[in-house]
Amino acid sequence: MKVFAVISALFMTVAANAGKPDLPDSIYVGGQLQHVQGIALDQEKGCMYMSFTSRFLKVDMNGRILASIDRIQGHLGAMTFNHQDRKVYASLECKDDEIGQNIAKKLNVGIVSESRFYIAIIDVDKMTSLNMDPENNDV
């Protein structure tokens, strides 16, 4: 099911770039604990960015994970890549509902008392390693 979600999401990106032979028709990134929420293509660097609820990945076009941000305290969802400033802008929901409480429990962080909505800004060029922490790394 997770593979299907990734392939479906990629289909939209690939379809939008039809006629560009350097793009694969699918990218498999291995088993993730959550389902894909958002994707963005960085043609200049030849990679993609993917959000998986509380995890953000930078992957090459073969699906190899180049860098990751883990323990994002909330629900990281839809996103877009701005090629001019080289940043990803993504919706980040910190909700006090059952889903938000489950995310907080899995990450062993405090549960929010009211829902909050943000735009997460990720400097993808500062993503250099796996398991980066959004609070302790300058990303």
Show which residues each predicted segment covers.
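Sec-dependent signal peptide recognition
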Residues: 1-9
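Hydrophobic h-region of N-terminal signal peptides that target proteins for export
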Residues: 8-17
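Beta-strand-rich domains and repeat architectures in extracellular enzymes and scaffolds
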Residues: 25-54
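Hydrophobic/aromatic beta-strand positions that recur at structurally equivalent sites within the blades
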Residues: 41, 59-60, 81, 120-124
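Beta-propeller domains
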Residues: 43-72
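Beta-propeller blade signature
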Residues: 104-127
